[in-house]
Amino acid sequence: MDETQGPLAMTVHLLANSGHGSLLQRTLDQLLDCICPEVRLFQVSERASPVKYCEKSHSKRSRFPGMSVLLFLHESPGEDRLFRVLDSLQHSPWQCYPTQDTRGRLCPYFFANQEFYSLDSQLPIWGVRQVHCGSEILRVTLYCSFDNYEDAIRLYEMILQREATLQKSNFCFFVLYASKSFALQLSLKQLPPGMSVDPKESSVLQFKVQEIGQLVPLLPNPCMPISSTRWQTQDYDGNKILLQVQLNPELGVKNGILGAGMLPLGSRLTSVSAKRTSEPRSQRNQGKRSQGHSLELPEPSGSPTSDRCAGTSWKSPGRSFQVSSPAMGAHLHLSSHHLESGARMKVLNRENSFQKLEAETNVDTGLTIINSEPRQTYFGGFPRDLQTSQPPFCLPASSLGVATSKNNSVLKERVSPLPLAGQRDLGTRKTISECLLHLQVQGEEKEEDEEEFFI
């Protein structure tokens, strides 16, 4: 298999109740360290408050778990790794996932020889399978309802900017990471007609994207910002999705500005989905789809706001169709200029900026995620706008001015006279300071000409 390495385009955020994050992270680390220690796919965050889920009635329709994680492992002579993994899944805190109903009948779409395990009813189910040839695989599978399968393929091709590998008529996958002996995949599986999907509310898929302005109007459900670099939406079956905008200071790639050799996002989206039908089924059934839910943003005091289900952390957005309307294209285009100005300021300190972009943070509270040894611990937090009680639908230009004044004070301190012992480097430091001030003045002039924009 061809090697596909580098930063992961997808991570899976698992939301645990308060006080249970460390245990969940350690449990996953112990399970995965012997399989793929070089890949950190799962990030654990703790909720601000316990969650109570509302059960939905589906009028005698079977529901299948929306997400699973399957480990395809070798069993070489003299090695007991496969049995050690199975043994871990059969002990606390893991629980065997029931594949039979209350009458003892096998649930649809489960095979008699398959066993699944789970840590919580709202977390993915896990399974282990033995393979005799090829590389070992960790596969995250999203189960799609029969009518949504083709649309889901187009959606994830558009987000990942790569074509899916079609293995069967009802199964496809994306290779996210590959080495000579291991592969990480995201797969889509079509369910039989009449079977609905049970989305896992405590599981959130996060994807890294280069540009958000052109992507938002093409999404099937409302997409709203929850921080300066993260936007939230959901797929056709209700799986929560986070889109993290990548601003790479090392390559000079800003939001809306592409580096050499990179195609515009619009052309890439067209080329990837050109083989699919021009009119998605979702547009024909738009009225039948449920509205998207939004991550609950805690109040400044720390207490979460209430919503339609007591204690639940997802709620329906008040302005569901404003974000994805055609008129929003111009406003989203303006937002890319402001993000571009913010990216220019981050060039002043590349190391700090890079750490902020790479840091994984709590998608529910905005605090640092729970990490356990021996993996590296990240101390970056969510941008502070996640701590506000309302989503940042409106971002006035004056807010950028506040940041500008703060940066001016920092630059003035850098240009202050040096002590006598450091006068030998005065010429060099003056040159650097003048360059920084020149960049800052350009940012101020651009901001004065722009009006406030709305997302």
Curated annotation (Swiss-Prot):
Secretion signal: which residues? none
Please give the residue positions where the record annotates the modification Phosphoserine. Answer: 49
Which region ranges are annotated with the description Disordered? 270-322
Q: Organism's domain of life?
A: Eukaryota
Question: What GO CC terms are in its UniProt record?
Answer: mitochondrion; nucleoplasm
One Pfam family in the UniProt entry:
FAM124
Residue stretches of biased makeup (Polar residues): 313-322
Per the annotation, which location comes first and is thus the protein's main one?
nucleus
Q: Which UniProt keywords apply?
A: Nucleus, Phosphoprotein
**Localization annotation:** Nucleus
Similarity-based family: Belongs to the FAM124 family.
Assembly, in brief, is: Interacts with CHD7 and CHD8.
Q: What is this protein called?
A: Protein FAM124B
Q: Which gene encodes it?
A: FAM124B
